[in-house]
């Protein structure tokens, strides 16, 4: 009879420990569930809020003074070759 009581106590403790473990895991998982931030400093608490596209290069059509100067798409230039002796400008 005492062996049965010890087994019941062991099962009760095991179930209690597993419930505590699962509740801790659920608390940690709640931190990750939600809408991720798309940009730095964005608050995504309202998922139906209108999302404006990020300004590319900090350029605003209303304030063209904030636009950065345009750069060539590929500024790479080939170096001097022995055969041309750096005489041509590409």
Curated annotation (Swiss-Prot):
One of its GO terms (biological process) is regulation of growth. Cell signaling peptide that may regulate plant stress, growth, and development. Mediates a rapid alkalinization of extracellular space by mediating a transient increase in the cytoplasmic Ca(2+) concentration leading to a calcium-dependent signaling events through a cell surface receptor and a concomitant activation of some intracellular mitogen-activated protein kinases. Belongs to the plant rapid alkalinization factor (RALF) family. Pfam families: RALF. It comes from the Eukaryota. The lineage of its organism: Eukaryota, Viridiplantae, Streptophyta, Embryophyta, Tracheophyta. The keyword S-adenosyl-L-methionine does not apply. The keyword Lyase does not apply. Coiled coil: none annotated. Disulfide bonds join 59-67, 80-86. This is Protein RALF-like 3. One of its GO terms (molecular function) is hormone activity. InterPro entries: RALF. Keywords: Disulfide bond, Hormone, Secreted, Signal. It is found in: Secreted. Residues 1-29 form the signal peptide. It comes from Arabidopsis thaliana. GO terms for cellular component: apoplast. Its main location: secreted.
